[in-house]
Amino acid sequence: ILAEDDPKTFDVKLMSVAKPLRIDQLLNKYPYEVSGGQKQRCAVARALITNPKLLLADEPTGALDSNSSRELMEVFKELNENGQTVIMVTHSIQAASGARRVLFIKDGKIFHELYNSGFSDYEMGQKIANTMQMLQRGDIR
């Protein structure tokens, strides 16, 4: 049993992550019966069920449609507001726009960063897009 929890505690934890990720209807299905996006949300649930202090997410929205991506980013934002640290690797401006801090990494080194000091997701997305344009032009080194 996961993390040595008793089955009843596990079921409560399972539903607490399954409902926000909209996978509660998938719990009795086999992997071949669900879509790629549903599998992605199940993977997130597996990562969250033990309530880790640090969540590492590598392209968590890669297999998701835009609605599911937005919902997942809301889950991550809520987790972060409740004290969990979320470190996410992404190429998605939309996914990064909700972050408090965005690091731009090139050749394994941090070469620029942005802090979100109260910007809306739209405003932060614009800052990220502008920074990416400057990086591509070579304006930031």
Question: Where are each of the predicted segments found?
Answer:
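Conserved catalytic loops of ABC-family nucleotide-binding domains
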Residues: 75-88
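A short, proline-enriched helix->beta-strand linker immediately N-terminal to the Walker B motif
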Residues: 49-53
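Conserved ABC ATPase signature
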Residues: 30-34, 38-40
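Conserved ABC ATPase "signature" region
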Residues: 8-25
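Catalytic Walker B motif of ABC-type/P-loop ATPase nucleotide-binding domains
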Residues: 55-58
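Hydrophobic anchor residue at the start of the ABC signature
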Residues: 44, 72
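Conserved beta-strand-loop-alpha-helix hinge in the C-terminal portion
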Residues: 109-133
